[in-house]
Design a protein with these regions (language model features):
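Conserved alpha/beta-hydrolase catalytic His-Asp/Glu region
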Residues: 100-102, 117-165
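Short, flexible active-site-adjacent loop segments at beta-strand->alpha-helix junctions, enriched
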Residues: 10, 69, 95-96
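Short aromatic-enriched loop/helix-cap "lid" or pocket-rim segments at secondary-structure transitions
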Residues: 18, 43-44, 101-104
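Conserved alpha/beta-hydrolase fold motif
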Residues: 65-66, 89
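Gly/Ala-rich beta-loop-alpha elbow adjacent to hydrolase catalytic centers
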Residues: 66-75
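Conserved acidic catalytic loop of the alpha/beta-hydrolase fold
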Residues: 46-63
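Flexible "cap/lid" loop of the alpha/beta hydrolase fold
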Residues: 80-81, 85-115
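Conserved HGGG/HGGXW glycine-rich cap/lid loop of the alpha/beta-hydrolase fold
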Residues: 1-42
Length: 166
């Protein structure tokens, strides 16, 4: 049975993928891939592709790739550019038409509204999860705050380039 290569560009929200990763790991070896960068440095799509290609080139055979959200968008764009490097690609919660992500909505709202980060996240979380529970919303907002502070977000200081549509 072949292994799974899980691309994870936003480790702060891996908790949403953990259950599936654990289930898959019962029958296959699951390898998680991410990278760290200094958030004060620009991180372009080509930088991510270079890191990803360097890792994939070291594998014995093209991996079966799983990716969620933004990671899935990046994986799809990578697979389009380097089709022979992935054995297969499974995308979870990826907009098949565009590169629209929760972070796109967050950044747009921050640009247009005179609201705090926490106010905007408190508004976005119930839209994403259909939850109206304050405790749950606070916890989920915390995950997204960590993601904004530490993970790759297109359009933030970490990346000045927009992602092309799929």
């Amino acid at each position: 049975m072949s292994s799974i290569f899980w691309i994870d560009l936003q480790p702060s929200v891996f908790c949403f993928n953990k259950k599936l990763a654990c289930i898959l790991s019962q029958s296959r070896h699951v390898r998680r891939w991410s990278f760290q960068h200094d958030l004060d440095e620009i991180c372009s799509l080509s930088t991510i592709f270079d890191f990803l290609r360097e890792t994939v080139d070291q594998l014995d055979s093209p991996p079966h790739v799983v990716a969620h959200g933004l990671s899935g968008t990046i994986a799809s764009l990578f697979a389009r550019q380097f089709p022979k490097l992935f054995g297969s690609l499974t995308l979870i919660s990826v907009d098949p038409i565009s590169t629209n992500q929760w972070s796109s909505h967050y950044l747009e709202m921050r640009r247009k509204l005179p609201c705090s980060r926490s106010s905007i996240l408190s508004h976005i979380v119930p839209l994403l999860f259909d939850k109206q529970f304050n405790q749950t919303n606070l916890a989920l907002s915390g995950f997204f705050e960590k993601c904004l502070d530490f993970d790759f977000i297109p359009g933030s200081i970490a990346s000045h380039s927009l992602l092309p549509n799929l």
